[in-house]
Amino acid sequence: FLGILVLLFVFYTNNLFFSIILVSILLFSLYELLRLKVKLNLFSGIMLFFILLNIALVYPITEIFSRNLFFTALLISVISDVSALSMGKLFGKKIIFPHISPNKTLEGFISGIFFPAIFILFFSYIAQFDLTIINILFQFIEIKPMLISFGHVLTFSALVVCSIMSVIGDLIASKTKRLLEIKDFGDVLPGHGGFLDRLDSHLICIPVFLIINSFI
């Protein structure tokens, strides 16, 4: 259900409404961070910088880049999160960040880094065969320009870099919360914490993905 809402918001709203809602969510995330009166350190400073950077990118997303690129960046982070969580629960044995995020395992970490690239490139290949359902789903993803400009190897590498940025964003948020001795940044989303808890893995991934695409 949440995925459908995101699709409707990203692709079926006008630029003004899209910009207002996106900026409002980011500003509320900024409020969630600042209201905790967190001392500015490396981790909170990085979060602050990337929240502000994402706010600054709202106009380029609507006027220069495309909603498809924005959605693709979101998808990279989501696939990274889901694959890391599921593979970590199923096969995870070795804890790699005990003082930052004690539930993060090496197996989940590796899955979160590589699975988004494998998933997106696999379905970009399948989409060539005019399979109706795949084509309908894949119309929201913009990866062909990267494949044409960079080739498969560099595109795969670029997607892996974006996945790493997603994981780093999540780890930075986890470290910030541990320093503050809190579980979540907020409680505006029942069962999910605050907006910042949902956005942490996207904050670095989105700018990096857009920067990579600016070279096309």
Give residue spans per PLM region.
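Juxtamembrane boundary at the C-terminal end of a transmembrane helix
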Residues: I126, L210-I216
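Juxtamembrane helix-boundary/capping and inter-helix hinge elements in multi-pass membrane proteins
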Residues: G92-F97, R178-D187
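Membrane-embedded alpha-helical bundles of polytopic integral membrane proteins
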Residues: F1-I164
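C-terminal transmembrane helix pair
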Residues: K177, H202-V208
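Hydrophobic transmembrane alpha-helices of multi-pass small-molecule transporters
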Residues: G3, P116-A117, R198, C205, ...
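Divalent-cation-assisted or electrostatically stabilized phosphate/pyrophosphate-binding catalytic cores
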Residues: I110, D187-L203
